[in-house]
């Protein structure tokens, strides 16, 4: 009897862990993505100017996932899993993403058979002009071209 209880308990714990992991990834996937409006934005511990600053972002157009809202505040998560609260006046609808693949190539057209025009390192911020099923047309620095959509964090789905 004790062995059956242990097996049942183990099975229940395993089930809830799997469901919890799956639902967290789905929640992020279906959330709205915005970007930072200014070169310097404060991430706060809670939804008010009374809460302490947790982190200072210093990158305009950094994409963030909106997790929750409270009045004029949005709870966000960035590509490094930092989370906290930002006032809505500091958020923009400008579409941007972060390159998550080492030495990604930007192509002149939306095919790997077109001319490569630049190579991106991990963590590079790109502005999204438009996306197709597998590709996004992006701008970064002096380069405009196409990159594989699955290399980007913060892309339009």
Model-found features: residue ranges?
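Bacterial N-terminal signal peptides that target proteins for export
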Residues: 2-10
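N-terminal signal peptide c-region/cleavage motif recognized by signal peptidases
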Residues: 18-22
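SH3-family beta-barrel domains
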Residues: 23-45, 55-60, 67-109, 115-133, ...
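Second-shell loop/turn segments in exported
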Residues: 47-51
């Amino acid at each position: 009897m004790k062995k059956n209880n242990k097996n049942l308990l183990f099975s229940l714990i395993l089930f809830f862990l799997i469901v919890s992991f799956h639902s967290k990834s789905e929640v992020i996937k279906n959330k709205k993505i915005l970007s930072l409006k200014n070169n310097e934005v404060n991430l706060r511990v809670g939804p008010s100017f009374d809460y302490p600053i947790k982190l200072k972002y210093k990158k305009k157009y950094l994409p963030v996932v909106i997790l929750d809202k409270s009045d004029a505040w949005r709870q966000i998560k960035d590509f490094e899993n930092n989370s906290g609260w930002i006032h809505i006046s500091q958020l923009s609808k400008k579409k941007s993403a972060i390159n998550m693949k080492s030495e990604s190539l930007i192509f002149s057209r939306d095919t790997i058979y077109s001319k490569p025009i630049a190579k991106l390192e991990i963590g590079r911020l790109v502005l999204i002009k438009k996306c197709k099923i597998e590709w996004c047309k992006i701008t970064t620095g002096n380069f405009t071209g196409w990159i594989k959509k699955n290399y980007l964090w913060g892309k339009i789905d």
